[in-house]
Amino acid sequence: EAGLPKHDSLSNMILQYGKYGKNHVYSHRKGKGMPSYDKLAENLQVGDLLVAKKRARHIMMFIGTLRDFGYTEEELPELAPYLDYALVIHCGPNFAYTDRIQAFLDAHQDDSYYKGVKTTDGGVAISIIGVPFGDAPNRGSYGVNDFAWFDMPDGYKLTIWDLPSATSFCWFRMNP
């Protein structure tokens, strides 16, 4: 809340459209449709929240675009058509964490501090919104989740968050 008046729960602000509709930038609701993915980020503000539902509700935060972070067509030829697509930060299942954390635990198996520590099935990740799954050069599954991703120059795996597969969604702005 950062010094602002206390606000309602995020769940209520998303679900109570009659009360909080002014905060809904775009959604699955009629009349609140989004622009095309290549124009979406132009109409968002860093900090806008994306709440989407597939099997359960998932909350993500808009952080900008690849171009905002200084990437170019030359640097990312596979992602060149998507440099202006929205990037979100979120936490949840992510295949990339399991092996990395297990490797760390294996390398420190003699350290009693890590005795009994199990690997995780996810963590904080950056994903891109709107890129068709089929356009990603890499695909995989972990548990019930399917992933498609691009390998970034620094080794990071930039996953696609597949918004078209959501049954409902809302881009939400705290202070419209």
What is the predicted function of each stretch?
Residues 4-111:
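...with weaker cross-activation on analogous glycine-rich loops/strands in unrelated enzymes
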Residues 81-85, 89-176:
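Low-complexity, Gly/Ser/Thr/Pro-rich intrinsically disordered linker/tail segments
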